[in-house]
Every structure is written in structure tokens, then in C-alpha cells.
Regions:
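Acidic, metal-coordinating helix/loop segments flanking the phosphotransfer/catalytic sites
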Residues: 37-55
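Conserved phosphotransfer microenvironments
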Residues: 53-76
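Conserved phosphotransfer cores of two-component systems
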Residues: 48-51, 75-81, 90-91
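Non-catalytic signal-transmission and effector/linker regions of two-component phosphorelay proteins
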Residues: 1-16, 81, 90-138
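Hydrophobic/aromatic residues positioned on beta-strands within the core alpha/beta folds
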Residues: 86-88
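Two-component/phosphorelay signaling modules centered on CheY-like receiver
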Residues: 16-34
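Hydrophobic anchor at the start of a short beta-strand
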Residues: 33, 83-84
Length: 138
């Protein structure tokens, strides 16, 4: 897979084993991955225009002041139609089209991100992409 800045993925999780497992699997699949363990670190990464982030996975609950919902809002400033993959205590629907998963496994996160990216290469209508994956949120 060719390196494309729109395919750069930011993985935000406080669990280092979960975060690095997902990151390593995505790197092994050929994706460019950046990680963060706090919302503040992730926020700065999202604002770094020299290395734009194309896709975002985050925990809803993060330490300090910036949580996953704030990160999703920041991400949507750049990609209003692309869904964010969010891990929350319970899966649910999102008014923004985000994919909210209830306590996902690393394998689930990997598969959802790969499906989103692959579908975006076939069809730029990311809003349609996310709606097809909402079934994982329930």
C-alpha cells in the first residue's frame, strides 16, 4: 500500500498494550501510524499541519482535560464527513456518523479502520462508509 497522508492514522488510547498492538498491526499492513496516550498529545498531533492525520481512533475517556469527544470534534473540522472510531463503555449510534464501539478488541479496531480506509479508496463518500459500519456499535 502506498503512503498517503490521508491514510495516516492516529491511535489514542491510555492502555499502552492496546495502543501499541493496534499500531503494530496497522504498520504491518502498510499504514502510517502515530500514537498518543493523552488527549492533549493527540490534540497537538491533530493540529500539526506538516503531518496531517487522515483517520482517528480514540478512547472516549482520556485523562486530563481533552477527551475523545473533543478530539472527534477537532478531527471533524478537517474531515467533516469522515467517521471517527471511538471506544466507549457502551456502543451506540452517533449523530455525527462516528463509529462508537463498546469496549472493542484490538482486532475489531483494526478491522473497522481497514474497512473505512479501503472503502474511502473506492468511494470518497465517507458518510456512506461510516453508516455501513454502525452495526459494530450496537
Amino acid at each position: 500500500m502506498g503512503k498517503n497522508y490521508r491514510d495516516r492514522i492516529l491511535i489514542v488510547d491510555t492502555n499502552p498494550i492496546f495502543r501499541e498492538t493496534v499500531a503494530q498491526w496497522l504498520r504491518a499492513a502498510g499504514y502510517d501510524v502515530t500514537t498518543a496516550d493523552t488527549g492533549e498529545h493527540a490534540f497537538l498531533t491533530l493540529r500539526d499541519w506538516q503531518y496531517p492525520i487522515g483517520w482517528l481512533y480514540t478512547r472516549a475517556t482520556l485523562p486530563i482535560l481533552i477527551d475523545g469527544w473533543i478530539l472527534a470534534d477537532e478531527y471533524h473540522d478537517t474531515y467533516p464527513a469522515r467517521p471517527v472510531v471511538i471506544a466507549a463503555p457502551e456502543g451506540r449510534s452517533s449523530a455525527c456518523g462516528d463509529i462508537v464501539l463498546g469496549q472493542p478488541s484490538p482486532a475489531t479496531v483494526l478491522e473497522i479502520i481497514r474497512q473505512l480506509i479501503n472503502a474511502s479508496h473506492k468511494s470518497p463518500a465517507a458518510a456512506e462508509i461510516g453508516s455501513g459500519l454502525q452495526q459494530h456499535a450496537a
